[in-house]
């Protein structure tokens, strides 16, 4: 079974995939937002390519656990993504995922300039790995 991780941003959407048996998430691609219908179609194409059976959307909570506008955006997007993919979609707390993604990219020697195109997919991998780790026995 494979799971798709989604880091939903206002400009870009990061995507990652995990094999639940291997329990490791990896960044796959970044979708530049062009409108919800096109965004959903692009995500669905990746989901089909990787034969995912579930998706996890990052829920950007504030540090105190409250929800702001970005969290409401994710909550609204999740059911539409579920309908587009035809697989269950869960929300998962993504606090500090972008910070962790930037840190991982820096550790691999990716320059700040080059991170812009990779940080969203890496953040999706951070979100998805956190979800996998939380489900570990």
Curated annotation (Swiss-Prot):
It is found in: Cytoplasm. The keyword Hydrolase applies. InterPro entries: RNaseH-like_sf (IPR012337), YqgF (IPR005227), YqgF/RNaseH-like_dom (IPR006641), YqgF/RNaseH-like_dom_sf (IPR037027). The keyword Nuclease applies. This is Putative pre-16S rRNA nuclease. Keywords: Cytoplasm, Hydrolase, Nuclease, Ribosome biogenesis. It comes from Anaeromyxobacter dehalogenans (strain 2CP-C). GO terms for cellular component: cytosol. Belongs to the YqgF nuclease family. It holds the Pfam family RuvX. Its main location: cytoplasm. Its EC number is 3.1.-.-. One of its GO terms (biological process) is rRNA 5'-end processing. Could be a nuclease involved in processing of the 5'-end of pre-16S rRNA. It is an enzyme of class 3 (hydrolase). GO terms for molecular function: nuclease activity.
């Amino acid at each position: 079974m494979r799971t798709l991780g989604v880091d939903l941003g206002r400009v870009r959407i990061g995507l990652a995939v995990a094999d639940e048996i291997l329990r490791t998430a990896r960044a796959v691609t970044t979708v530049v937002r062009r409108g919800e219908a096109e965004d959903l179609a692009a995500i669905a194409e990746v989901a089909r390519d990787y034969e995912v059976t579930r998706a996890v959307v990052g829920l950007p909570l504030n540090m105190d656990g409250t929800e702001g506008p970005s969290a409401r955006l994710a909550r609204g997007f999740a059911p539409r993504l579920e309908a587009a993919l035809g697989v269950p979609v869960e929300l998962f707390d993504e606090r500090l995922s972008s910070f962790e993604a930037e840190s991982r990219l820096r550790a691999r020697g990716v320059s700040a300039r080059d991170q812009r195109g990779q940080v969203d997919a890496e953040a999706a991998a951070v979100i998805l790995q956190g979800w996998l780790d939380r489900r570990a026995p």
